[in-house]
Structure formats: structure tokens, C-alpha cells
């Protein structure tokens, strides 16, 4: 008990000059926790001793761990443009400025300006998406997983949905197509084999209980070698003949203006829409906007989705709608430079090399400019890469990777060397990167 009295008052810890740079609420929160934990340890072992400096060190470590876990701006030097762990697509500052007036004010989110009555939150965005994709109707939910669930639950609940075994995919976070189908209330009917599915497999599987054929884009892996699948066009011809629904879960879809290294054999959303009744894809992947599930297709099916009570749970907020709408308008105005994902994907080698040389000339550290390859990321185009330039450092790669990470720079290890890939590094981050490099090398 006497040892407990030796603990300094909480106010003494909170007001210590060593913690002065931290927010008061964090000092108070962690001081109480650390003192409480130390007292518990002391009650178990009376030989322990905690000095003022011991307590301050523990509080500092706890606050630092807490702050490092908070959202923070990073420099993406991995070369992976749509980096799932680093926030996928980013929003251009000009797009952000356009949305500020809507986000920071009251708006006509669900208010019809002509009638003065309640309106639909989807109207403004839907109007622009329909022009961009030349589709009958559209709907937006909070992500593509929600889109898949809503479509299956609305259009095929308690009915059979046919899909190829080669498309029973798993994406990040253990999101598996078969389990989603089960949760949505549909009966999965698998056809074909892992490496081969033929048109006759679909034809034989269709019966009076069949409601839909689901085709899923294998966006995060690729089959090579002895492999065969049925095209979306062939499936759509069959579904029209059999009067059932064709749904394409695209996952990550590109709209316009994509690098020639990537576009080969990769159909656009517009092209795919010609060969299915309904499709869905992510807003924050190749489309280059914020997280959302964008659903396009026949009006009669979209209208059914809008009547499902689940939509209330899956709907997007005004901030998401504003960002998506401004991105869509940027596409319509052909302002591709205002969509960072597109810009980074389409940057030519001279632009990338120029960024790398700018850094190399500004730092007094030995490094080598090398040609390399970047990836798209975001579970998109796994078998394709883009030419790039990197700065390669000779020091211990893993140690250097950790040092840069602590400075907010995320690079990669390649052939035993730590490298910074300049395809994914933003122009606005170059000076910040110079400062980080100098700090890492104490230059």
C-alpha cells in the first residue's frame, strides 16, 4: 500500500514538460491507464519499482502507438497505384474543392427543387452516370460487395444462380462469392471445372428454377495454360434465349483513357454493358473515385433494386455522392488529369524519370536510377504491369524499409534492394520525400 503512495499524482504526469507536445486528452487518458496497470503489477510483485521517468516513458510509448494507428498522409512509393492498404484511389484537390460547397452546406440531397417536395438522393449522380455509360438506369451503394449482395437478393432470392467453378473467387477480407450467394438467399449451381467451362455446361444446367447466370471477373488473379471460358457475349445470348438474367460482377472496371499497356484484352464498362442485363463495379478502383458499388443495367432490374428494403442499409451518404458525381463530370468533360488514378496509370516514362532525377539530384545519398515495373493494384489486372523508374538504395533493404515507413514513406524491396517507385509518387509529395530521405540517412 505504501508503494502506491509513491506514485505521482495524475496531474503531475499530465503536466510534465516531456509530454507537453501531446494533446491533453491523450495525456490524461494514457496516464490513468499506465498508473493503473503499474499498480496492478506492483500488487503482484512488491519488488517492482516505477520511477517518474519509467511512467513517462510508458505513457509516451502508448501515445505514440496510438497516434501511429490514426489515419495519416503517406507517400506511396510502392509503384502499386490502386494500393488497397494505402486507401486505393485518391481524390484530386480540384475535385475536393468542387465538393466542399455541397459537403459544408445544406444541400438538395433529397429535395426536389422544382416541386419543393422530397426528392431522391440518387437523381443527380444517376443522370450523369447514365450519360457517361449510355445505360438505361443505375444505382450506387456503399461498395461492390454490397452491390453483389443486393443484386442477388433482389433478383434471384430462393432461385438458382449458375456460375462457373473457375469464378468462385475470394477477394480481400475473406469475401467469397459462394458464401455471399448463400447469405443473399440464392441457390448456387456450380458448373464446369476449375480450368475449363464450356457453353454447353451452362445450357445443360438451366432448368425451370434458374433465375440468373452470374459471371465474375477474376480481377485479382489470372489463369494461364490449359484454360477455357465462355465469353460474356455468349452467355448473354443464351440468357436472352432462355429468358433469364445475365449479371456481370466486374469488380474493377475502367471507363476511358487507359494506358495501352493495360487496355489490350481488357474490355471497358461501356463495351461490357452491351452483353449483360446488369453489372457492378467498384468506385474506388479503376474508376478512380471514392468507395462505392456502381450498378448499371436494364431499368426494370434497377427499379427492383431500389424497392428492396436492404437499400436503406446499403445506401451512400452525401459525401460519397458528391465525390462520385464530380468524378463522373470530370469524365464527361474529359478532364482526365483531375482523376489521379488515370493520371498515374497514363504517365509516360519521361514524366516518371523526371520525378526520379529531381529527387536524385537533391539528395547527397548514393542511389541508382533503374528501370522497373509497376502494378495497377486494387485487385485489378493481375497479369499486367507498367514500365517505371525507381531509385534503388544499397543499404540493408528491410532495415531501410522500416526507417522510411517511420517517416511516412512506403516503398518496396526488389532484388534485395529497397526502392522508391516514382510511378505512384505524386508531384506534390516530392519535396516532402526529399526531407524524409535526408532524415532517414541523417544527411
UniProtKB/Swiss-Prot annotation:
Its cofactor is pyridoxal 5'-phosphate. The modification N6-(pyridoxal phosphate)lysine is found at residue 285. It catalyses: L-seryl-tRNA(Sec) + selenophosphate + H(+) = L-selenocysteinyl-tRNA(Sec) + phosphate. One of its GO terms (molecular function) is L-seryl-tRNA(Sec) selenium transferase activity. One of its GO terms (cellular component) is cytoplasm. InterPro entries: PyrdxlP-dep_Trfase, PyrdxlP-dep_Trfase_major, SelA-like, SelA_trans. Keywords: Cytoplasm, Protein biosynthesis, Pyridoxal phosphate, Selenium, Transferase. It is found in: Cytoplasm. It comes from the Bacteria. GO terms for biological process: conversion of seryl-tRNAsec to selenocys-tRNAsec; selenocysteine incorporation. Pfam families: SelA. Pathway: Aminoacyl-tRNA biosynthesis; selenocysteinyl-tRNA(Sec) biosynthesis; selenocysteinyl-tRNA(Sec) from L-seryl-tRNA(Sec) (bacterial route): step 1/1. Its EC number is 2.9.1.1. HAMAP family: SelA. Belongs to the SelA family. Converts seryl-tRNA(Sec) to selenocysteinyl-tRNA(Sec) required for selenoprotein biosynthesis. NCBIfam families: selA (TIGR00474). This is L-seryl-tRNA(Sec) selenium transferase. It comes from Campylobacter lari (strain RM2100 / D67 / ATCC BAA-1060).
Amino acid at each position: 500500500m505504501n508503494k502506491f503512495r509513491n506514485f505521482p499524482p495524475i496531474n503531475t504526469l499530465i503536466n510534465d514538460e516531456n509530454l507537453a507536445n501531446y494533446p491533453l486528452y491523450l495525456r490524461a487518458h494514457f496516464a490513468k491507464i499506465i498508473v493503473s496497470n503499474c499498480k496492478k503489477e506492483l500488487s503482484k510483485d512488491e519488488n517492482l519499482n516505477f520511477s517518474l521517468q519509467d511512467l513517462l516513458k510508458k505513457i509516451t510509448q502508448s501515445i505514440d502507438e496510438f497516434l501511429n494507428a490514426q489515419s495519416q498522409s503517406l507517400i506511396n512509393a510502392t509503384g502499386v497505384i490502386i494500393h488497397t492498404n494505402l486507401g486505393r484511389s485518391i481524390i484530386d484537390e480540384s475535385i475536393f474543392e468542387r465538393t466542399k460547397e455541397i459537403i459544408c452546406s445544406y444541400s438538395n440531397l433529397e429535395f426536389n427543387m422544382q416541386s419543393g417536395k422530397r426528392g431522391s438522393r440518387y437523381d443527380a449522380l444517376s443522370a450523369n452516370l447514365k450519360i457517361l455509360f449510355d445505360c438505361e438506369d443505375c444505382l450506387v451503394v456503399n461498395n461492390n460487395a454490397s452491390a453483389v449482395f443486393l443484386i442477388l437478393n433482389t433478383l434471384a432470392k430462393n432461385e438458382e444462380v449458375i456460375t462457373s467453378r473457375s469464378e468462385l473467387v475470394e477477394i480481400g477480407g475473406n469475401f467469397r462469392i459462394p458464401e455471399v450467394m448463400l447469405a443473399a438467399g440464392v441457390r448456387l449451381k456450380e458448373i464446369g471445372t476449375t480450368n475449363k467451362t464450356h457453353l454447353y455446361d451452362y445450357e445443360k444446367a438451366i432448368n425451370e428454377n434458374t433465375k440468373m447466370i452470374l459471371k465474375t471477373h477474376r480481377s485479382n488473379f489470372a489463369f494461364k495454360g490449359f484454360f477455357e471460358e465462355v465469353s460474356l457475349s455468349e452467355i448473354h445470348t443464351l440468357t436472352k434465349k432462355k429468358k433469364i438474367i445475365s449479371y456481370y460482377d466486374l469488380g474493377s472496371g475502367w471507363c476511358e483513357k487507359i494506358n495501352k499497356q493495360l487496355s489490350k484484352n481488357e474490355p471497358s464498362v461501356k463495351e461490357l454493358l452491351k452483353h449483360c442485363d446488369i453489372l457492378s463495379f467498384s468506385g474506388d478502383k479503376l474508376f478512380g473515385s471514392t468507395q462505392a458499388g456502381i450498378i448499371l443495367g436494364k431499368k426494370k432490374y434497377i427499379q427492383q433494386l431500389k424497392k428492396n428494403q436492404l437499400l436503406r442499409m446499403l445506401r451512400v451518404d452525401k459525401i460519397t455522392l458528391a465525390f462520385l458525381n464530380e468524378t463522373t463530370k470530370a469524365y464527361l468533360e474529359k478532364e482526365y488529369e483531375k482523376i489521379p488514378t488515370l493520371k498515374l496509370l497514363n504517365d509516360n516514362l519521361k514524366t516518371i524519370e523526371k520525378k526520379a532525377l529531381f529527387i536524385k539530384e537533391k539528395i547527397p545519398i548514393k542511389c541508382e536510377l533503374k528501370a522497373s515495373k509497376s502494378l495497377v493494384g486494387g485487385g485489378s489486372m493481375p497479369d499486367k504491369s507498367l514500365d517505371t523508374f525507381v531509385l534503388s538504395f544499397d543499404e540493408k533493404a528491410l532495415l531501410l524499409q522500416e526507417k522510411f515507413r517511420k517517416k511516412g514513406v512506403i516503398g518496396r524491396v526488389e532484388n534485395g534492394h529497397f526502392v522508391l517507385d516514382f510511378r505512384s509518387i505524386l508531384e506534390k509529395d516530392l519535396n516532402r520525400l526529399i526531407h524524409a530521405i535526408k532524415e532517414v540517412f541523417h544527411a
